[in-house]
Every structure is written in C-alpha cells, then in structure tokens.
C-alpha cells in the first residue's frame, strides 16, 4: 500500500491524505455474509440523545466476521481481500475445503491464493490461528481471545498486534501495543502476525464533512455554550472554565483513572505506560 497526498484543488482537498486500495476487491461483498445495520443515531426509543456526537452517516451493511476461527484442520484458501466500512482493518474472504466461506480479519502481507489453517496442529505462519499454548514465546500475534471460545477481542484494528512474552502454568503473559502486560489463559486462541492496513494511521480526512459521512457529529466546547447547557458556559466575552474541567453533568473529566473493574484487575501484570 501507499499513501497519496491529494492536489489542493479546493480547501476540502488541500489537506487530504489517502491510503491506496488497488489490491482490494472492487466488486460487491459476499451477500450471504451481509446483515442489515440500522442507524441508531445515539438515540433511545424515546428519541432522546443517549450518546452524544452520533448521527447521520453513510448507510452500509455489516460484514459477519469470523472471530472464533474454530474450523480446525480444514484448509481455507484466500479468495480476495476487501474493504470493510465497519472497521479500520481490511477483511479477507476465505473458502474452506468443505465449501464454506467466511470473512476473517486480514493479517499483514496476506496474499490472494494463500492457504490458512486453524487448530493446535496449524503451522506457525502469518494468518494461522492456534491456542496460545502452541504459539512460540516471542511471537507477534493479533485477534486474541480473552476467554477460551469467546472469539477474538484484543488487537483487531488496523496495524494492531501484541507480543507473547511468557507462559506460566495455565496463563500466558501478553504485552499490548500500549505497554500493558496482561495474563491470558493458554487455551485462548490467537492469530499469528499483525493486522493489515497498518498505514491507516497516516490518513488525513481533510474536511469536517468526512466525519459526517462516518456518522460523527460536531463536538461543541463547554465554554462556548450557555450556562443552562454546560457548567463551563456563560460569561461576558471569552472566558475560561472558572473551575476544574467537568462534563455537562458536572463530573470531573481530566487527570484521573476511569478504570474500575476489580473482577479482572488480577489479570493485569503491569499497567500501560502514559
């Protein structure tokens, strides 16, 4: 893939940086693996906003992605690599030897025609999925399960990966890109390699309208509002907050940790680095 900087033919094109997609499938997606996706627009059944900054956006179908990779011992051939509007990563359509087709998260450097395998006996090769107990220490992995059989939950976005550091008893230690080291059960599955589309982070949207196409509405600063709308609002002319930063409901919103999940606290070996 390559990055293209657009010519400044208009103010909206001047800052645009795109990632090329020549290698992606240019036809329609595989229809049996599509599901309708209804726009909630951040509203509940009463029409009240429950999540701010959401609404509008381009309509698209949901691609059913196989995060479990549980067809063990059956070879799957990569038929094509596709764009998925629901995620930053690309997806690959694979056809198993028994004729079933599934979408998977495309790993880096995956080529059309490659053969993938799942299961404990699968070779250590990019795109193959194995239990962590069968993966060599030091390997780069992605699409990692948190519970055996629950499907991948960690390292699924474009360019994401983690590193298998060690195995101790029934748990392995995995280091995330953030620097956090976490214990994961050795029966959980992971896929070898990194997620494709690693240049996604270099993309620049160029104009506000692209965010609207994505279903993201503007974020208004509290100091620009009236006092009835936000604790930071009001004042004559341009004024500051006049207090510690808070959200529209008066809760402190800067400078403290928000994680509070004692149930899984013991699984974290070391916290992420700031």
Curated annotation (Swiss-Prot):
Q: Which domain of life is it from?
A: Bacteria
UniProt keywords, alphabetically: Ribonucleoprotein, Ribosomal protein, RNA-binding, rRNA-binding
Bias type Basic and acidic residues, positions: 229-246
Name of protein: Large ribosomal subunit protein uL2
- Give yes or no: UniProt keyword Transcription regulation: no
Q: Give a GO molecular function annotation for the protein.
A: rRNA binding
PANTHER family to which the protein is assigned, alphabetical: LARGE RIBOSOMAL SUBUNIT PROTEIN UL2M (PTHR13691:SF5), RIBOSOMAL PROTEIN L2 (PTHR13691)
- One GO cellular component term: large ribosomal subunit
Cite the Gene3D superfamilies for this sequence: 2.30.30.30, Nucleic acid-binding proteins (2.40.50.140), Ribosomal protein L2, domain 3 (4.10.950.10)
GO biological-process terms attached to the record? cytoplasmic translation
User: Which InterPro entries does its entry note?
Assistant: NA-bd_OB-fold, Rib_uL2_dom2, Ribosomal_uL2, Ribosomal_uL2_bac/org-type, Ribosomal_uL2_C, Ribosomal_uL2_CS, Ribosomal_uL2_dom3, Ribosomal_uL2_RNA-bd_dom
Annotated spans, Disordered: 223-274
| Family of the protein in this entry | Belongs to the universal ribosomal protein uL2 family.
Pfam families named in the record: Ribosomal_L2 (PF00181), Ribosomal_L2_C (PF03947)
Asked whether the UniProt record includes RNA-binding among its keywords, one would answer yes
